[in-house]
Amino acid sequence: MNPPGKRETLKSIAIVGAGCSGLAAAHTLRDAGHSVTIFERSDEVGGRAATRRRQGFTYDHGAQYIKGASVVSSALITERFPAADLVDIAKPVWVFNQQGHIQEGDPLQNREPKWTYRSGLNALARCMALGLEIRGRTRIGHLRRTSAGWSLFDSLGHPAGEFERVLIAVPAGHALELIESGLLPEAERESICVQLRRASYRPLISVMLGYQPTPRVRPYYALVNTDKTHALSWLAWEHEKSPERVPRQMGLLIAQMAPHYSREWWWAPSEEVIRDVAKHVATLLDEPLSSPCFTDLCHWRDALPAETTDGEQLNAIALPLGLAFCGDAYVGGRVHLALEHGVAVARQIAGTW
């Protein structure tokens, strides 16, 4: 509600980016009675909470699950946007080191819920997108500060709309491009750019390997490399999330490669990458896996923040201009943190009126 004496009017807000943070912010702002328009450069929502469906396989090739330890994100998942196919991955995550030694993981972390959906992790973002005004396949390339707020332009220079506030919910590199090319006060622009340049990301190659017959049953759902020296950063048994995700008598492993490996193999042909990754997987598991019957590959340039920047300092500079930022560049690369940050920053924006 507006403070006493303030006239209640519908305020217009543009959100650049339909990832989980931007979607959470959109609902928070709509709940406060504001008009929200989201601009998304792709035809999908959810960012790295992404799901593919190919040849009978359903798999999450970006973020793997949502940690359930947070009150805010858990309320969004279980109460605000409930779904019949929501599941808590039953098996734990174990760990391995450079030598390939596998052992049990942190028992405290493994007690926390690991939320996903039978139909894919992207189910949350698709549910959150319902009822929102989202302009897909629209890359915002330019911002201009006006006396009434902000003018937005797409990457071709065409007008995209006039708004009183703008929330930028994209990776820091894209946000930096928008500010560097934007027309806004010079001192504030440089201060914002200084903050955004402090954020950096790790690249990640995600490789999907389908097998028939199903790989050997393990006491864990996934393995994570804790000393960060192995070529494999993460290896998950995707069919453990839900048997409906794979064709009958098949299994699907998801290998997410370490930053150093991903950089080295970034431009290599897909077939060579898949072949090499399959060898690393078979060696780690010490299991005579057959040749994969299904493969897929995805390059994530901005997979996880290597360095975050101070979102509070950034928004302290930006909010007086009617501008704000949210997302993983400020809180780290976890879906639940992105959801929380979107809600928190949206509340800050609503409080500026």
Predicted feature descriptions by range:
Residues A24, E44, H61, R248-W353:
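Conserved flavin/dinucleotide-binding core of flavoenzymes
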Residues M208-E264, A282-L285:
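Active-site substrate-recognition segment that forms the wall
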Residues K11-I38, A346, A350:
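N-terminal Rossmann-like FAD-binding beta1-loop-alpha1 element of flavoenzymes
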Residues G136-S151:
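A conserved short coil-to-beta-strand element within the FAD-binding core of flavoproteins
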Residues T51-W94:
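N-terminal FAD cofactor-binding segment of flavoenzymes
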Residues G46, P159, E164-A222, E287:
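Central helical "cap/lid" subdomain
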Residues Y65-V72, I102, D106-C127, W267-V273:
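Short beta-strand to alpha-helix junction loop
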Residues R30-R54:
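Glycine-rich FAD pyrophosphate-binding loop
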